[in-house]
Each structure stands twice: as structure tokens, then as C-alpha cells.
């Protein structure tokens, strides 16, 4: 295997977000944060496959489950995940790319930080 899988619980208000990190077996530079669209969870086959592919090519990849349709809630969840990565001290990344799959067609929304 070209990467290691680590399960996480990320603080989000008075709850915890379920998350999985795929950590490449080489030095980290950039990370990618993925979540599902309005339905499903982080274990959707296309998210798992994408995360595995990215990690096998040297990208740190974190996917998480974010229940709820409210966009403000989802943005706060992304911010909590990003803050966790920045403050945990475990993962030193030069930058992070955020992505979300929406709809049946797997259309991707993304931004980078």
C-alpha cells in the first residue's frame, strides 16, 4: 500500500465529525479535503476511490461526513476540518484544496486555500 489510513473524530461545535485521512508514505506537501454532497457520507465509493488515487500519487487526502443540507452548516464544518489540520501539528501541509461532490453526476465544486 502506498498510503496509511487513519480514522479521526474532528471537533465541530458540541459534536464530532467522522473523518478518514489517507497519508502517503512519502513526505507531505499538499492536502485535499473531500466531502459528499447533500446525501450520502464519506464512504461513497467514488469518494473512497478518488481519495485512494490521490494518496497513491502523493497527496494527503482527508474525507469527512457532513450531515445537513444547510450551506452555512457545511461551510462551518469545512472550516472546522481545515482548522483541525492547521492546529493539530500532525500534518505539515503547504496548502489545502477543498472539494465536494454534488448530484447524481458527480459534478465537483472546489476551492483552494
What does each model-identified segment do?
Residues 96-112:
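Glycine-rich nucleophile elbow surrounding the catalytic serine of serine-hydrolase chemistry
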Amino acid at each position: 500500500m502506498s498510503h496509511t489510513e487513519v480514522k479521526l473524530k474532528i471537533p465541530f461545535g458540541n459534536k464530532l465529525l467522522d473523518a478518514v485521512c489517507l497519508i502517503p508514505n512519502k513526505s507531505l506537501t499538499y492536502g485535499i479535503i473531500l466531502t459528499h454532497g447533500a446525501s450520502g457520507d464519506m464512504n461513497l465509493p467514488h469518494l473512497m476511490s478518488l481519495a485512494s488515487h490521490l494518496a497513491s500519487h502523493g497527496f494527503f487526502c482527508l474525507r469527512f461526513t457532513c450531515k445537513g443540507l444547510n450551506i452555512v452548516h457545511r461551510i462551518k464544518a469545512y472550516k472546522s476540518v481545515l482548522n483541525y489540520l492547521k492546529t493539530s501539528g500532525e500534518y505539515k501541509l503547504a496548502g489545502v484544496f477543498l472539494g465536494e461532490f454534488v448530484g447524481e453526476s458527480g459534478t465537483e465544486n472546489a476551492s483552494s486555500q
